[in-house]
Amino acid sequence: MEAQVFLASGSPRRKELLTQLGYQFDVLSVDVEEIHQEHETPLMYVERLSKDKAQAGVKAIEKTKNKYTPVLGSDTIVVIDGVILEKPKDFKDAKRMLLALSGRQHQVMTAVTIATPEKIRTKTVITQVWFKTLSEQEIEQYWESGEPCDKAGSYGIQGSGGRFVSRIDGSYHAVMGLPLMETDQLLHQFL
């Protein structure tokens, strides 16, 4: 069956969630530099990255595939006190982030963009997440599991990092990397 959409992401979580929605899709590998600009608020940043990924996907398929097939780009960031927590560079970085989140509330922002050469639409979901207080031992054991290495904010809610979450207000799937309802609504505008 022909793809209904191209997913401009290598994230296994986004692949899993798009599959859950029941869409036929192909994965595109896009290279987008993820550098926060000084003038950007966290919201502007996550939306720009989402759009950049979708537009890079549109450019990638223009010459080789059906250029009218929509491309989905998405990005997720973790924000506490207005500071963006990216993927950790090493254990020290992950520990710094997890200690900052420990016992506190933070935001997870996920932007989803669908693009074709003629049209682009973006939706952003902001979810409030509360963490329990973490011990240094919990942080070390979590790091040793390998799970935090490729995750914004150094945790994955869908894995063992979920044990740190005491409450959420918003979309669980957005925290994972792709809000289901909003993604489905966007795709319906294109299909």
Curated annotation (Swiss-Prot):
Keywords: Cytoplasm, Hydrolase, Nucleotide metabolism. One of its GO terms (biological process) is nucleotide metabolic process. GO terms for molecular function: dTTP diphosphatase activity; UTP diphosphatase activity. It is found in: Cytoplasm. The active site is at residue 75. InterPro entries: ITPase-like_fam, Maf-like. It catalyses: dTTP + H2O = dTMP + diphosphate + H(+); UTP + H2O = UMP + diphosphate + H(+). Signal peptide: none annotated. Pfam families: Maf. It is an enzyme of class 3 (hydrolase). The record marks 13, 76, 158 as: Important for substrate specificity. Its cofactor is a divalent metal cation. CDD domains: Maf (cd00555). The keyword Cytoplasm applies. Disulfide bonds: none annotated. Its EC number is 3.6.1.9. Belongs to the Maf family. YhdE subfamily. Nucleoside triphosphate pyrophosphatase that hydrolyzes dTTP and UTP. May have a dual role in cell division arrest and in preventing the incorporation of modified nucleotides into cellular nucleic acids. HAMAP family: Maf (MF_00528). This is dTTP/UTP pyrophosphatase. The lineage of its organism: Bacteria, Pseudomonadati, Pseudomonadota, Gammaproteobacteria, Vibrionales.
